[in-house]
């Protein structure tokens, strides 16, 4: 039996966020440090690029941005760490969030997380992901 493709209708997207499965869960917790990543940073730098900025949301400051996929295969189930940096550039706190959806090859995917301090600098690190099979299956 052939599976029907998942369509991202407005109702599905709303239910996704209400269920807490999106890029931000209401209980996003900041901890002292991020877990160790699954891939070498040199490989990640070849495959992906990140961009992030602190913006003001309805419920306070947030870190939002994109993961850009430069590789010839899509990535899915991507977990990222967002590190709050001290003035000297050292990580002082971290939260982990799932990137919303997949990161298609040659494209980008969005992420967002609440930020504890709008004036702080933040760094985004990819902690883990799975390569998608060719053909998107």
Give the residues covered by each predicted segment:
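Intrinsically disordered, low-complexity Pro/Gly/Ser/Thr-rich segments with frequent PxxP/GP/PP motifs
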Residues: 94-118
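Beta-strand signatures of extracellular beta-sandwich domains
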Residues: 79-83
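Bacterial N-terminal signal peptides that target proteins for export
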Residues: 1-10
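Asparagine-centered strand-capping/turn motif at beta-strand->loop junctions
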Residues: 67-71
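Terminal connector regions
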Residues: 116-137
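A short beta-turn/strand-edge loop motif at beta-sheet boundaries
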Residues: 72-77
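Transition segment at domain starts
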Residues: 22-60
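C-terminal motif of bacterial Sec signal peptides marking the signal peptidase cleavage site
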Residues: 18-20
